[in-house]
Amino acid sequence: MNSEISTLVPDPKTFKEKKKEQEQYFFTDKVLEQIIKSFQYFENIVCICAPTLADAFWRFLKKDVYCIDIDDRFNYLPKFIHCNITKDEIKFPNDFKPDLIIVDPPFFGLNLKDLLNFVNKVSKNDNKIKLAIGYLIREEKNLLITFKDYNLQMTKFNMEYRTVDQTKWKNYGMYTNFECGKFKFE
């Protein structure tokens, strides 16, 4: 699958020219593969600020997941919703309720309270919903305090980003409120 992901996910060179204000960090092929394999059995997935992950679900599992992002380069995805999570309202079909929300937010330009408010809107204030957030380990305390009602914990999952030097990957962690596949608690 790795070779397929390399050829189908948008070319990382393109994203070297990313818009800096969007603080885009895209997962490596290995991470994309591990995430979609771990979460493939969830039915109603929402990816917030994780467009290459939504792309991988769609291309490799033929799974239409909601992709909420500001980057219109991903508007080819069937359930892409252009949204600035600090300003825009989000609308889903009335009967839609996610069973998994995956978030890989900008680490510096986004207030965690704004992110929490948005996640609450998407989850319809259900803090029992399965939630996975990639975040800076040095900001763990702030993340866990802000999302305390979701009972997040750090997992052993190794985060890797294409546009981040490998020596810095240890600075990122995946926090969830459940264990599944490669996502196990420490």
Q: Could you describe each region identified by the protein language model?
A:
Residues 48-54, 109, 138-140:
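Gly/Ser/Thr-rich loops at beta-strand to alpha-helix junctions
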Residues 112-181:
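C-terminal substrate-binding/active-site "lid" region of AdoMet-derived donor-dependent transferases
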